[in-house]
Amino acid sequence: MPRTHAIEDYRNFGIMAHIDAGKTTTTERILYYTGKSHKIGEVHDGAATMDWMTQEQERGITITSAATTAIWAGKRLNIIDTPGHVDFTIEVERSLRVLDGAVCVLDGNQGVEPQTETVWRQADKYNVPRIVFVNKMDKIGADFYRCVEMIVDRVAGNPVCCQLPIGSENNFKGVIDLVRMKAVVWEDEALGAKYHDEEIPADLADKAAEYRNKLVEAAVELDDDAMTAYLDGVEPDVATLKSLIRKAVIGRKFNPVFCGSAFKNKGVQPLLDAVVDFLPSPIDRGAIKGIDFKTEEDTVRMPSDDEPTSVLAFKIMDDPFVGTITFCRVYAGKMETGMGLLNSTRDKRERVGRMLLMHANNREDIKEAYAGDIVALAGLKDVRTGDTLCDPAKAVILEKMEFPEPVIEIAIEPKSKADQEKLGIALSKLAAEDPSFRVSTDFESGQTILKGMGELHLDIKVDILKRTYKVDANIGAPQVAYRETITKKYEVDYTHKKQTGGTGQFARVKFIVEPNEVGKGFVFESAIVGGAVPKEYIPGVQKGLESVLGAGVLAGFPVVDVKVQLIDGAFHEVDSSALAFEIASRAAFREALQKGSPVLLEPIMKVEVVTPEDYTGSVIGDLNSRRGQIQGQDMRGNANVVNAMVPLANMFGYVNTLRSFSQGRATFTMQFDHYEQVPSNVAQEVQAKYA
């Protein structure tokens, strides 16, 4: 099947927001108005098209980013619905990596919320151009202008209004289009499918003129000719203004702001027009960087069908009907069923079996995919999230994704031998699907340990194990992922000697072991000159050091942020071996950790509590009792917002405590911020418990 749309007519975009801002509802309306969905699904009755996992429909939150394709105004939209809950940040990060643009949905009542800040930062990291949709304008307390201010205050964005609301709360009727200077009004009885232009209401004419001037001034600033004409009193026409706004969005100079109520079917079609008019195509985003597989030099791939095939796998899912499916973005070249590709990340060959175009939860078989497409592949053997699939003759490794370390863990014990077998298969599939979910075995107890980004993250994984994979298991209480490090420099000189008749073992190593910069992890370097330790034994030295990192000397937690320099050593012509140096390095490193003033580190969470004013005192008192440090508080609407840094160890079960003393009226979000040294009195308790 030949290409149906030119690559410049593609819009690969995601919808990102805080939980409950109305992201999935907005996507549902987009699918409805573009003709992909014959009935509108509502999140609150568990029928939304994009939320297709049972866990999502029950909880009313989006967990996995489902990709779907739709057509609007002759353009092909590939939409990725991303989760807004902080425990699923990894999903957002993955989808932003493969998007060209994004729509940031705000709750008209709440404005910029904690997860909005997180997603905005992630979009900055990947340089994703974005437009803003202020949703829920029909809600009590909705305030469009406050939301616009919050974009500046909270995320240092540069919002420029392209629309203004007509009315708010129950009287929200439509929007003023500042580009065309018309009022757009929706007809309630037609499920939002019908709307018409009117003249701008007289009471809003001055405000519309004021914001129109701001829009035009922001737009013409980016173009010398338009600026000159504007200063001469010539305003840009509609087509020119649109092209200037597009230029500003693609260059990330400002963020156009639109408004509506997806639930009340108002504002969605102009938002779709804005996606088409202002968000970039793959051509606008330009070449993607990569590393040449053979030479390891930097290279690029242009978004063109004529380039060598270069594809990035950004999500793996286990589908009950098709098996494992891999969501991919074709960055360059074209891909056909039956084609042989190289997984350059793992240096393994793969063959493209079945290729699917996904629409939320139904799928369409296709034979070819072209540059710019987002498709799902079934039947790949060994592909993980972030892997590159490419033409073996011109292999490339595209930029890798970065995944956060888990901060919370639970032990899981299958109830029977049959469960044990099912658990192994299920966990390997879940870990392949989600790189922020890790599985390990506790060496001492033999228990299987699940690690994740938060309580909800692990709750849902356990739920999937029980429902989808029918694994019956006992689940332990959540544990904190502590770390260990050292606080002072130590020089260690260690000799390993063993003589048992025949060839013995001999190795001497001398290290300088010192604290590394926070977050830099473990670093090993060899400063050996003159062959005191022969080159062939250096890998043995490194292996010995790395074998200690998994279990520190205080309570057996992983060791982080330590720098080790090999400065001297000695070897024996006959008795030395890589194994001898491995043993010597292991013992030397453990000694250095013990003598380097070791400390425990714990994850500190950034906590935001939104509470009615009556409960603010209780919230602050409770957070203080949890070793929290209050960072500040401000008002959001008529609610008080308390920001604090609190150790994760003290946040278990917080949701129930908060619910009980606020009668369910206060809410909170938390996300990992950094690791910090555990106070000595608490450290003693932790060591007593784990050592």
Swiss-Prot record:
<dbReference type="InterPro" id="IPR009022">
    <property type="entry name" value="EFG_III"/>
</dbReference>
<dbReference type="InterPro" id="IPR005225">
    <property type="entry name" value="Small_GTP-bd"/>
</dbReference>
<dbReference type="GO" id="GO:0005525">
    <property type="term" value="F:GTP binding"/>
</dbReference>
<dbReference type="InterPro" id="IPR020568">
    <property type="entry name" value="Ribosomal_Su5_D2-typ_SF"/>
</dbReference>
<dbReference type="Pfam" id="PF03144">
    <property type="entry name" value="GTP_EFTU_D2"/>
</dbReference>
<dbReference type="Pfam" id="PF00009">
    <property type="entry name" value="GTP_EFTU"/>
</dbReference>
<dbReference type="GO" id="GO:0005737">
    <property type="term" value="C:cytoplasm"/>
</dbReference>
<feature type="binding site">
    <location>
        <begin position="81"/>
        <end position="85"/>
    </location>
    <ligand>
        <name>GTP</name>
    </ligand>
</feature>
<dbReference type="GO" id="GO:0003746">
    <property type="term" value="F:translation elongation factor activity"/>
</dbReference>
<comment type="function">
    <text>Catalyzes the GTP-dependent ribosomal translocation step during translation elongation. During this step, the ribosome changes from the pre-translocational (PRE) to the post-translocational (POST) state as the newly formed A-site-bound peptidyl-tRNA and P-site-bound deacylated tRNA move to the P and E sites, respectively. Catalyzes the coordinated movement of the two tRNA molecules, the mRNA and conformational changes in the ribosome.</text>
</comment>
<dbReference type="InterPro" id="IPR027417">
    <property type="entry name" value="P-loop_NTPase"/>
</dbReference>
<keyword id="KW-0648">Protein biosynthesis</keyword>
<keyword id="KW-0547">Nucleotide-binding</keyword>
<dbReference type="InterPro" id="IPR004161">
    <property type="entry name" value="EFTu-like_2"/>
</dbReference>
<dbReference type="InterPro" id="IPR009000">
    <property type="entry name" value="Transl_B-barrel_sf"/>
</dbReference>
<dbReference type="InterPro" id="IPR004540">
    <property type="entry name" value="Transl_elong_EFG/EF2"/>
</dbReference>
<dbReference type="InterPro" id="IPR035649">
    <property type="entry name" value="EFG_V"/>
</dbReference>
<feature type="domain" description="tr-type G">
    <location>
        <begin position="8"/>
        <end position="283"/>
    </location>
</feature>
<dbReference type="Pfam" id="PF03764">
    <property type="entry name" value="EFG_IV"/>
</dbReference>
<dbReference type="InterPro" id="IPR014721">
    <property type="entry name" value="Ribsml_uS5_D2-typ_fold_subgr"/>
</dbReference>
<keyword id="KW-0963">Cytoplasm</keyword>
<feature type="binding site">
    <location>
        <begin position="135"/>
        <end position="138"/>
    </location>
    <ligand>
        <name>GTP</name>
    </ligand>
</feature>
<dbReference type="Pfam" id="PF14492">
    <property type="entry name" value="EFG_III"/>
</dbReference>
<dbReference type="GO" id="GO:0097216">
    <property type="term" value="F:guanosine tetraphosphate binding"/>
</dbReference>
<dbReference type="InterPro" id="IPR041095">
    <property type="entry name" value="EFG_II"/>
</dbReference>
<comment type="similarity">
    <text>Belongs to the TRAFAC class translation factor GTPase superfamily. Classic translation factor GTPase family. EF-G/EF-2 subfamily.</text>
</comment>
<dbReference type="GO" id="GO:0032790">
    <property type="term" value="P:ribosome disassembly"/>
</dbReference>
<dbReference type="InterPro" id="IPR000795">
    <property type="entry name" value="T_Tr_GTP-bd_dom"/>
</dbReference>
<keyword id="KW-0342">GTP-binding</keyword>
<dbReference type="InterPro" id="IPR035647">
    <property type="entry name" value="EFG_III/V"/>
</dbReference>
<feature type="binding site">
    <location>
        <begin position="17"/>
        <end position="24"/>
    </location>
    <ligand>
        <name>GTP</name>
    </ligand>
</feature>
<protein>
    <recommendedName>
        <fullName>Elongation factor G</fullName>
    </recommendedName>
</protein>
<dbReference type="InterPro" id="IPR031157">
    <property type="entry name" value="G_TR_CS"/>
</dbReference>
<dbReference type="InterPro" id="IPR047872">
    <property type="entry name" value="EFG_IV"/>
</dbReference>
<dbReference type="Pfam" id="PF00679">
    <property type="entry name" value="EFG_C"/>
</dbReference>
<dbReference type="InterPro" id="IPR005517">
    <property type="entry name" value="Transl_elong_EFG/EF2_IV"/>
</dbReference>
<dbReference type="InterPro" id="IPR000640">
    <property type="entry name" value="EFG_V-like"/>
</dbReference>
<keyword id="KW-0251">Elongation factor</keyword>
<dbReference type="GO" id="GO:0003924">
    <property type="term" value="F:GTPase activity"/>
</dbReference>
